[in-house]
Amino acid sequence: MAQVPVSKEPRHHLVFENDKVRILNVLVPPTDTTQYHVHSTPSVFICFTKTHTGSQRINEQPEYSTSVAGNVWFEDLSEPHIKIHRVWNMDTSVFHVMDIELMSKEKSFVINTQAIHHAHLQIDSPWARAYSIQLAKNEDLRIKNQPSDFILVAINDAEIKMVENGKESTSFIKASEYYWINANDIFSVINAGYARADFTLVSIK
C-alpha cells in the first residue's frame, strides 16, 4: 500500500523548517481521511480541538479516540519506532493538531530543566522539553538569556503584547500561531485580554 512521508501528506501543511525542527500544521476536515503516511522522527504533538477521530496503522485494526484541546505529547518515532498510519475525522468540525518534528541527531540536553515563571514542565525527553503556560490578564512570560531555542505555540485565541529584543507589538493571535525564539533572545509576552491565554513552550535540543 502506498505511503508518503508525513511532510508530503496533503493535510499536513509545512509552515516552518530549519536545521532543528520541521513544523506541520495538520488540518483534517469532517469525514475526510489522510493518506497512509510515515512518521520517522521524534516529534512533539499539540492538539487544538476536541474531535472524534479514527486511526489505523498499516496492516492493523482501526482505533478510535477523542482528542483534547491543549493536549501535548511526545513520541520517539525514529528507527525502529517508525509509524505508518492514516487518520480520519469522524466529527462535524475540523481536526487540528501540530506536529513538531525534531531533526537533531543528538539525544541529550547539556543543561537542566529551566526555571521560567508561569512555565510548568510537561515533557522532558532527550530531544525536547515542553512546558504548559497559563497567563491570566496582565500576567507575562519572560525568556531571557536562555541557552536553548524555543517555540511558543498559542493553544487558544488571545490578545497579547509581545516584546522581542526591544521591539514591541500588540496583536490578536489564533490557536496554533507560533513564535520561534532564538537562544539568548530577550522575549516576553503579556496577556492583554480578559480571558486566560494558554500556550505550549517547546525547548529545542
Question: Can you annotate each of these PLM segments?
Answer:
Residues D32-Q35, N71-R86, E139-L141, E177-I190:
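Histidine-centered metal-chelating micro-motifs
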Residues M1-S7:
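Bacterial Sec-dependent N-terminal signal peptides
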Residues E79-M103, D157, N182-K205:
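Ligand-binding loop in jelly-roll beta-barrel domains
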Residues F16-D19, R57-E79, G166-N184:
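Short acidic-glycine-tyrosine-enriched beta hairpin
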Residues L77-P80, I84-K137:
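Surface-exposed beta-loop interaction hotspot
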Residues P10-Q35, T41-F45, A115-N145, D149, ...:
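A short glycine-rich, His/Asp/Glu-containing loop-to-beta-strand
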Residues S40-N59, Q146-G166:
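Glycine- and acidic-residue-biased ligand/ion/polar-headgroup-sensing regions
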